């Protein structure tokens, strides 16, 4: 029988994902069979699991930390926002349907069975399963039918450790306040708490620990310092992008418009990690920088809607000027679709406008189709004749004259398009910048000749460093009980 523990937070972005990844790596280093699990995730950053189907990329990273194959059962419910109040629902890796917020609340009891089935699957054969909650259990307005936090924990009988973020301030109030508004049954599930993102002398918080224990009766299982290594992990959500508006001061400036429904933006992390690259995420109300050598249009969960927003910001004019100056453009997935002449959605799959004019930087057209392509892929770059490894998650088929110059051969078939002068490139392959040889050749084409790090190795090293920090700062008796 697998041991289980669930990390829940006093709020969003308290660091649960990194802590789960760190605990998974710590357990894996101790020789345990450990697996991550998140009942419900909301993210447009998706991965293709090793057994096929979509999961949140955070759970994919956690499976990497656990040194175990990823599975759709590690994240049985994935919500991919398409509009301000509506999301596509992925259940056990497959599209289940679409729902707005209130409709989804009514669906949750129906989804609980799939969540518990997946949890049983993940537990089978494991020594330890580390579960991540979503948001906070303090959102008691969402408690009825909950499958993400206490609703899951009580049904599955998983003890909870509450995580508070001291870096944002008010951590004592957030922990004590969470206990105050939980009902008695939910409070009983909490075994203790962790303080995360502490800076400075930990002994200065001794009085805080005593105060929290006095108010709640909960033991403190550790005070975790600010984990600098976590900045080398792939970005999980757009909250992180807001903080990373500008990354690096390198010789090559790359601009990325922050589309409202941006998806799979962790494609850009390998470029962000390069010291000689300045990656600029351009917010609404800002111009695309005129001195950028390359503009990357990232993935989008709603291509037609994001194309309209791109025009509202005037970025279409900025892109046209960029190309006239000799600049280069790469479009990935939804960004590739935007580069063409037209995007059509005759079945209303994206739920918005039926047709939109594209940027006409590539002579191609896209039509959305109900069948979703979801697969891991091996490819070869047509530009640089190097191997690529990545994945595809997209709706739609793109055709046109520029497709006779494919940007890559994926699983033996042509993919994407290149303009006649080679300055505009589109592809459906996510993860191409994570292929070290491709990234090196791309940067060489801009005159950068420095040695390139192995991106995967840098992520592995960061996970090991985080595991080491947790081993040093978590309560040894609690940790010994967890690791058995």
Curated annotation (Swiss-Prot):
Keywords annotated in UniProt: Cobalamin biosynthesis, Glutamine amidotransferase
CDD domains from the UniProt entry: CobQ_N, GATase1_CobQ
Pathway noted in the entry: Cofactor biosynthesis; adenosylcobalamin biosynthesis
One annotated GO molecular function: catalytic activity
Pfam families registered for this protein in UniProt: CbiA, GATase_3
Domain GATase cobBQ-type, residue spans: 251-438
Domain of life: Bacteria
One annotated GO biological process: cobalamin biosynthetic process
Catalytic residues, chain numbering: 333 (nucleophile), 430
Role according to the record: Catalyzes amidations at positions B, D, E, and G on adenosylcobyrinic A,C-diamide. NH(2) groups are provided by glutamine, and one molecule of ATP is hydrogenolyzed for each amidation.
Membership in a protein family: Belongs to the CobB/CobQ family. CobQ subfamily.
Listed name of the protein: Cobyric acid synthase
Lineage: Bacteria, Pseudomonadati, Pseudomonadota, Alphaproteobacteria, Hyphomicrobiales
Gene behind the chain: cobQ
